[in-house]
Amino acid sequence: MLHPVWGCVVAVMGVLWFYSSGVQSQCWEHSQCRDLASEANILECIQACKVDLSAESPLFPGNGHLQPTSEDIQNYVMSHFHWNTFGQRMNGTPGGSKREGASTALSVLLEALSQPRDEVERESEEEEGLQQHRRDDKRSYSMEHFRWGKPVGRKRRPVKVYPNGVEEESAESYPAEIRRDLSLKLDYPQGEELEEVFGGENDLLNLQKKDGSYKMNHFRWSGPPKDKRYGGFMKSWDERSQKPLLTLFKNVMIKDGHEKKGQ
């Protein structure tokens, strides 16, 4: 059974021989590769071949674009992108392989999907309550710009006028007995006085009806002067001026005289 070191040496030599075959066997012609009896000579030959390949020959001779890149170059290229890191272990050390990173991501996904149902429902209820609170705040903000939204300050009460001349003190501040006495002290018209007041108005209405014309004396259009009725257009023939008609006849007569002279 071969030693692990010799197995690695044989594998590396095979790779170098495969790559060096396309560059006219420059590696095997090197002076350090003629004596391969010892392990030190083999390592020196490998080092010399690597230097020759990197300095004189391309990385992939022939159809190099169809061949996969080496692991070193692939790692160098992938180190510049964030997806080169496939997660971290639980103890804080970076993941060793893609499979470990994928398993870590899968475990995180399973933990997120396996949350209790009550927590999800509670989160949804909190979100709905927050949205409702935002809608209420927006509605109250818009209603503040109108007078029916929120009254500004204290509502002003109407001023009450009392017949006894006391306006500063309200009658509601008095006790019930005093308020009753105040109401009894008010001077209300008696029956005879009411008959005199309404009797005089009835006599006036009867006189107006006897004349045959009922006029609304409380309004300005009850009886306007004749010269101002309908803007002065409803005047009689006698009241109107005769000058426009005389001027018309005069103009007609002058026109007829000119026509006869022309003939």
Curated annotation (Swiss-Prot):
Composition bias, Basic and acidic residues: 130-142
Principal subcellular localisation of the protein: secreted
Valine amide: residues carrying this PTM: V152
Source organism superkingdom: Eukaryota
Signal peptide: 1-25
GO function term, MF aspect, one: hormone activity
One record GO biological process: neuropeptide signaling pathway
Post-translational modification: Specific enzymatic cleavages at paired basic residues yield the different active peptides.
GO CC annotations, alphabetized: extracellular region
InterPro entries for the chain: Mcrtin_ACTH_cent (IPR013531), Melanocortin_N (IPR013593), Opioid_neuropept (IPR013532), PMOC (IPR001941), POMC-derived_peptides (IPR050878)
Residue numbers carrying Pyrrolidone carboxylic acid: Q26
Region described as Disordered: spans on this chain: 114-142
Disulfide bonds: C27-C49, C33-C45
Record keywords, A-Z: Amidation, Cleavage on pair of basic residues, Disulfide bond, Endorphin, Hormone, Pyrrolidone carboxylic acid, Secreted, Signal
Cellular location(s): Secreted
Stated family: Belongs to the POMC family.
Protein name: Pro-opiomelanocortin
Organism of origin: Acipenser transmontanus (White sturgeon)
Origin organism lineage: Eukaryota, Metazoa, Chordata, Craniata, Vertebrata
Gene it is expressed from: pomc
